[in-house]
Amino acid sequence: ESTTVRFAMQLGYAGYPEFQRALEEMVMNRLNSVQRMQFTYGRVPQGEILETVLQSDIEKIKMTLEEVDRSAFERAADTILSARTIYIVGIRSCAPLASFLAFYFHMIFPDVRQVQTNSSSEIFEQMIRITEDDVVIGISFPRYSMRTMKALEFANSRKAKVITITDSVHSPMNVYAACKAGR
């Protein structure tokens, strides 16, 4: 059991109970995704697909509003506003989200860099000058990108601030996050 506790702590959890809750939540989220797909495919009458999808989105937005840690959100906003350079990392299915965020941040901030990559070495080449005055925004959802994790680890090692956009407070992406809930 002590090996399991050490493993959980090595992953960034306070202990085994927190790790267990995160695993349970991840399994629930995946099952819910499968269930939602099964429900939508062939079970929603043709004329109600749009309404069903939009209603689902409305419910998710309401849940986010209820669950978001507002102080963590404010810290993230302040961190972005005070950063010298903003790096945005989103790989594979998260690349369009990173591109969207970078596009609009370019209109507001003087130095925004979308880290585009096919390999871990490219990430480090694009982030080589990152310092404690900078921020990295990492975007990843299940199945979490190891390259994004490596980018956040590298940024953290260089004392840059890390902000994550992910699916859960228990996401492994939050290991290096500077703006965690409750902190």
Name what the model sees in each region.
Residues 78-183:
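Glycine-rich phosphate-binding loops that contact phosphosugars or nucleotide phosphates
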